[in-house]
Amino acid sequence: MIISWYGFNYFKLKNTSHSLIFNPYGLDKVSKFSKAKADLILFSDPNQIAKAKLNKDAFIVDSPGEYEVNDIFVYGREIKNNIIYYVVFEGIKIAFLGEFGHDDLANGDLELIEGADILILPVGGGDLTTSKEASKIIQQVEPRVVIPSCHKAGSGKLKADNIADFVKEFGVKPEEEEKYKIKKKDLPQEDVKLIILKTQK
């Protein structure tokens, strides 16, 4: 599986057969994205669908529930107008927190994503999760890989904290990647890995 980041909260996951996209939109009213092409497109905020350019054949998920598309399993739960997702793709468990704010994860929410292999979560503060809050969530979920989103490097004109603030708070040496390629058998078994992705054009 290859994970790519296109800025803010826009991620694409793909293998040789299928693909999945999270949140193909920006919130700064300036960022422009090309048409999102994937088998499955997930939205944390259904109100943003109108802003996104989507291929007509994609299966769109914009509400909580359970879904299965091309052997990709999706579980969505709404928390204060934001849908968090738990996805199983190629046997890898991915927790995606979308535009999660300053709330604590309730027990039921934590049960959904606890033990995920990969955790993608905002770290840039503002209306979204701060570095300190993100670090607490990571301790609760205990993922093997952490991928930060919504930090200054990919947020366009939005005000957001630098990724360096999160790195300092989290205390794990990061690995910077253009794209993150991972197979289930290669997931780290002991120490958590922090992956900082560069934005794709």
What are these regions (language model features)?
Residues 1-29, 79-98, 118:
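Conserved beta-strand hairpin/beta-sheet module of binuclear metal-dependent hydrolase folds
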Residues 1-16, 28, 61-70, 188-201:
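Zn-dependent metallo-beta-lactamase
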Residues 2-6, 145-201:
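Binuclear metal-ion centers of metallo-dependent hydrolases, dominated by the metallo-beta-lactamase
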Residues 13, 41, 74, 99, ...:
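Divalent metal-coordination and catalytic microenvironments
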Residues 24-26, 46-47, 79, 97-102, ...:
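Active-site metal-binding loops of divalent metal-dependent hydrolases
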Residues 27-66, 110-120, 124:
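Active-site metal-binding motif and surrounding structural segment of the metallo-beta-lactamase
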Residues 51-95:
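Portal/gating segments that form or line small-molecule/metal binding sites
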Residues 80-141:
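Active-site-proximal loop/helix segments of hydrolase catalytic cores
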